[in-house]
Amino acid sequence: MMDGTHAIKRSRSRSPKVSQSKSSKKKKRSSSRCRSGSDSPARKHSTLAKYRAEVPDRRKKERRKKRRKRTVSTTSSSSSESSSSSSSSSSDDSGDSTCKSKRSSHRKKKNKKQIKRKKAKKNKKLKKKTSFKLECQDTKSTEKEVLPGPSVNPCKKESPEVSGPALTDEQKSRIQAMKPMTKEEWDAQQSVIRKVVDPETGRIRLIKGDGEVLEEIVSKDRHKEINKHATQKDGLEFQMHSGMF
């Protein structure tokens, strides 16, 4: 039995169709190898030419991509910078607005305080004026109550009444001296110049007003005698002081 099966297999494997197919495949492979061996340098040359032609195109494309990336990066950076600058400007504007609002509020508070102070000062002044007016009115009313009659000047003194005989010139002069005088009367009295004779020396003096001595009128002989007496007195005083006499 075993021998029969092996024989069948061998017969099947050695069938003419199978052997033809195998031979055709081998021929195709050998032909393809021959063609590839004969055509390999031409193909290699064409592939190198294609690669060399494609290299600059690829480089150009890569450069374009890099440029695009750069432009995109620059635009993104510029946009980020603009956004940052806008944010900083907005923050600055907000800070300025807050500072301005604070300053305005501070000024308003100051103005309110100043207005209040001015009003308080005015009220104080008005109160003082009203109180002073009331005090003046009160004093006037009290004076009227105390002095209902005619007003009496304390400076004007009544002349003393003398009963008996008539007054002498000395008494009259004393009474006049006791009376107050006006400025005009005083000037008139002081402008009067009188001549007075001294009985002891015999000099004539010009006296203005109450006692101002203007000039002494003396004769020549009397003037010489006065000078002699003056020199003698001066010499005696000098000797007394020096211890000579």
Swiss-Prot record:
Keywords: mRNA processing, mRNA splicing, Nucleus. Belongs to the ARL6IP4 family. It holds the Pfam family SR-25. The keyword Nucleus applies. Residues 1-171 are annotated as: Disordered. It is found in: Nucleus, Nucleolus; Nucleus speckle. Residues 135-146 have a biased composition (Basic and acidic residues). GO terms for cellular component: nuclear speck; nucleolus. May be involved in modulating alternative pre-mRNA splicing. It comes from the Eukaryota. Residues 23-32, 60-71, 100-131 have a biased composition (Basic residues). InterPro entries: Nucl_RNA-splicing_assoc_SR-25. This is ADP-ribosylation factor-like protein 6-interacting protein 4. GO terms for biological process: mRNA processing; RNA splicing. Residues 72-98 have a biased composition (Low complexity).
